[in-house]
Amino acid sequence: MVTTEVRTAVSDKEPLQRSPELDSSTDFLDNDRLKETFSSGALDFDEWTLLISEIETTSFPDDIEKLCLVYDAFLLEFPLCHGYWRKYAYHKIKLCTLEDAVEVFERAVQAATYSVAVWLDYCAFAVAAYEDPHDVSRLFERGLSFIGKDYSCCTLWDKYIEYLLGQQQWSSLANVYLRTLKYPSKKLDLYYKNFRKIAASLKEKIKCRIDVNGDLSSDPMEEDLVHTRHTDEEISIVVRELMGPSSSSAVSKALHTYLSIGEQFYQDSRQLMEKISCFETQIRRPYFHVKPLDTNQLDNWHAYLSFGETYGDFDWAINLYERCLIPCANYTEFWFRYVDFVESKGGRELANFALARASQTFVKSASVIHLFNARFKEHVGDASAASVALSRCGEELGFGFVENVTKKANMEKRLGNFEAAVTTYREALNKTLIGKENLETTARLYVQFSRLKYVITNSADDAAQILLEGNENVPHCKLLLEELMRLLMMHGGSRQVDLLDPIIDKELSHQADSSDGLSAEDKEEISNLYMEFIDLSGTIHDVRKALGRHIKLFPHSARAKLRGSRPSGNLFRELIQRREKTRERLNQDLLTNKGISSIVDSPPKEKKESSLDSYGTQSKDAVRADYVNTEPNQGCLTSGHLVEGNDNVIERETLCESQSDLSMGLKANEGGKRSHEVSLPIQASPEHGFVTKQAHFSSNSVDTVKSDAIVIQPSGSQSPQSYQSQESLRQTGRNRYHRRDLNQMHRDSKPRSQERPPQMPYSPVGTGREILGQHMAFTHQDNRVALQSSTSQNPQNQFQNSALQMHPVVQTSNAYPQSQIHGQHMIVSPPESQNPQNQCQNSTSQVQTSFAYPQTQIPQNPVQSNYQQEGQMQSHEAYNQMWQQYYYSYYYYQQQQQLMSEQPQPNQNPQPQLDQNLVQLLSKQYQSQAKTQYLQPQQVEQVNTQQQSQEPQNQQQIQFQQQQQQQEWFQQQQQWQQQQYLLYIQQQQLQGEAKGDEQRLSMPQGSTTNSDIQKSQESGAVNEANLSSDTSISSI
């Protein structure tokens, strides 16, 4: 029986008496019901704790049998709950004998061998209950042998030191102080101080003995300490000599060795403590609980274990693993790691013991631990134990059932038990074929069984038979059909086509309802896979048969293949939308710059809004009209060059409908009049950081006639001589506008392969208004000249830009010679005449010009010669009008120069006045640009360099230089005009001689045609000669 002192030490409460009223209300807690509940495993941790609290405090506080039943069942499930072991032992102390309490503690240390709290409770019980001090000391030593290396075992060390001090066991106390320094702990520094104190007391004892006996030996504390390694047996001998009745010299030597061992232990522990302090400080829960640990805690333990494995102390690493498995007992990953580590170090017994604890107690419900145990047993050669362990892996249906069966059968195959492997699958299939709810599990088992059968027998027929059996037991299963086709595709070959085709045909022709059969998507996938198989293994007859069935069942797939992919129809719509955005942005920029620009707006009648067709795209006429009437920005008018920025590039790329669209320069206004537009190639130079682009026009031969030309008249004038030609042009233009609309339908289908070249915009000039920076610029780079003409505000006489396309070398045969300005070919021809004899086509011309309106077809038969003189007269009139327009434009340009230099005229429109500094800056910029336009490229570079390095020169000097340069240029133009006129007279003479020969001939039509061809060739040769002479003159 337990003594009264033990009862008092364990519990201060008096035993509670059972109340009779509770007997009737606690029938549900009878032992049989409790055993049934415990065996079912239906209780979780919280329910267990509630049940124990109910029995202890209310129902059966003194029923030791019921308490033992509950505690035994609970601690079997959760053996690491040291608090419940202590409570269970206290119940034994109160209600049973001391031996019963000792038995409980022994079970506790067996279940939780490395738990500091369990050993502390056990030793505290021993100090209070045991009468023999040696029994208590042996219990302390036993516990310290397991947990003495634990970082948190200082509580047990403190309890042991307290007990030894009470018992005055100095020899044992000296040994304990030395051992506390061997491994790092929370109180390592405190233990070292106590060690130094006991060493000092021993030194005083030795000094007293020396004084009494007169021993002259040296003081051991003054000698150098030599650090050497000592075993536990040697340490015990040293302590025995130190505390025993030995001579002073022996005691002094023992004390020196004792101090040396202590210092070595402390230094080593201190170094190790510095390394593990980072891990120890992150441990938040060193005890067991069912609540999961956070990720940081788990990662810290993994890192701590990795350090322990590499440190080199196997015993300390084992203690670290055992300490980790207390809070991490529910994590199988740590058990796997522990077993692998100790097995790699040769501790197979420790590995088996760890696996037994994990698979039977701590994580026994996890199938992975049983699988790991089985593979470990198989690895060590224990096949029977491996089979037993594998039998515990989820034999019940549910999650992981197929995997467990497969692994068990594969293990039997590895062990050579082929029949046992087949039996494993057969037993599992018998379980799954009982109900229809396990059809998916059954199909997966058949797939794995077929693979195992092929590996064992190396026969595709045997494996296919397993799958055919599965298809009969689990009909309309996509998984089995796919596995069967893949198996036969890899191993069966053509001999299995007759076997597989009826099965596939049956599945595809089966009419699926809501509960049976394959879906339409599954059928299509099965049919596609079968066509792959039949294409690989079948004949052409089989392929056509399978393809016909597939198209019949799934016609949409065939249509998709035949139709293919087409480009999106929204590309053109997006292009038109980008055009609209670009045009709106340009208009906004023009409105923004209107304060410093003096551009005269176009008449409202000609500013038409772009219309959209039914598909949301803008018509070509609207786009062309909007583009032609768009006002140029201030930069273009001021500099005289066309600077190509990003917006201009987008504008030209998107608005270029076709090559022929660039050549159309006529636009009918609402008043019936026609405005003429002329645009020439422009040589732009880099200026103000922008990259300018060379304007390059190319002619288009579509719907063009060589005799078509454009009438150029001075602005604001209509001479009587030109009225007849203009009226003829109006009549012809009305008829051709209808044809141009028809020709646009043909041009839409042509690719837009050419980038729209930049054009120099021309705006009309109003009376009394000054256009700031508007002038005529001539450049000599690449033999190109940009001519800008100014016209009146009258809508009937207004000149607009024309998109004439030219190349540097263009040969045309018209009624008059081509006008050339410094190597540039500018085409100017009279209005269309009804006399086709005046239209001489040049067969050797490389590029034909494309005029501003569609051309009418010219009959090939010659007409009466009385129209010849009228055509020549019109040619002379057009030639005179061209040079009259040129002189007028040049005179008007000089007037603008003078007005600009003297004083700026106020704008007619109510606009805010410019700042005087801004006006001066714009004037200087305009004058510098006008100067550089008439210089050679080398001179332009010199002028730019001088302008950057020197201050701006006087305005009068710049104007004087400009006038001199203009006079020199005008003299050159007069010489060139005379040469051109001589060439023109020669050409007219040659044409007159050729036409006179035609009139003298009176041959049939067939011979006339041959002679015309010969004469046209001769005329082409003459034109080539004239062209070469023109080129030479222009180069001069």
UniProtKB/Swiss-Prot annotation:
Residues 1002-1036 have a biased composition (Polar residues). Residues 740-755 have a biased composition (Basic and acidic residues). Gene3D superfamilies: Tetratricopeptide repeat domain. It comes from the Eukaryota. Keywords: mRNA processing, mRNA splicing, Nucleus, Repeat. Residues 714-726 have a biased composition (Low complexity). SUPFAM superfamilies: TPR-like (SSF48452). Its main location: nucleus. One of its GO terms (cellular component) is nucleus. It holds the Pfam family HAT_PRP39_C. HAT repeats lie at residues 62-94, 96-128, 131-166, 168-201, 278-310, 312-344. Residues 1-24, 595-618, 714-767, 995-1036 are annotated as: Disordered. InterPro entries: HAT (IPR003107), TPR-like_helical_dom_sf (IPR011990). It is found in: Nucleus. GO terms for biological process: mRNA processing; RNA splicing. SMART domains: HAT. Belongs to the PRP39 family. Involved in pre-mRNA splicing. This is Pre-mRNA-processing factor 39-2. The lineage of its organism: Eukaryota, Viridiplantae, Streptophyta, Embryophyta, Tracheophyta.
